[in-house]
Amino acid sequence: GGNVAENSGGVHCLKYGLTIHNLLKVRGVTINGEIVEFGSLGLDAPGYDLLPLVTGSEGMLAVVTEVTVKLTPRPQLARCVLAAFDDVVKAGDAVARIIAAGIIPAGLEMMDQPATAAVEEFVHAGYPLEAQAILLCESDGTPEEVAEEVGRVRALLEQSGATEIRVSRDEAERLRFWAGRKAAFPAAGRISPDYYCMDGTIPRKRLGEMLQAIQAMETKYAMRCINVFHAGDGNLHPLIL
């Protein structure tokens, strides 16, 4: 119900969409106790399409009691590429290059140095602490599709000036790469329990420029901030500590 109320996404929403893209039907209860249903199992159901209205309504329209979802087959293989950069602008450029090349990764996430430092103290994911920014780029599909896409991504990362590139060798290493990213918010909470999480979207080609602007504001206003976000769709999450 919470996912429906917020139209939640996540690290794999770049390829697989938000909650609304994976819903068929929602049942809920309105404030006056009326049981209502939105959506249908059929694609050509009559009437207004109100499912997108209730999805993301943050509980204002109904309390969700039942959800019918689409199921997507699990891919045969997934590999995660970890790339380190000595400059946030280069990392932002790499994101723009990947998307401009027509590649839609299963996930494309970015973390700056303060974020990776906080995460390493918390979960020990093996991130390169000397990097000013890291990218996590996941490819999934058949073994042949994954190999081809990883090769293209690696070439683009090298063109963008990556100082280190690692490809997960097995499922355990892939999960370890992602464990750090998924623990970023709890890791920030260990440093500052009352941090503020911002949420905004900007053009991917301006990511590096935006991160530099955030760094300038940190200096100007004597504040601390870590950045961990969905780079593939330009969705920033600066955490003000």
Name the predicted role of every residue range.
Residues 1-109:
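FAD-binding subdomain of flavoenzyme oxidoreductases
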Residues 69-73, 79-241:
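C-terminal substrate-recognition/cap domain of FAD-linked oxidoreductases
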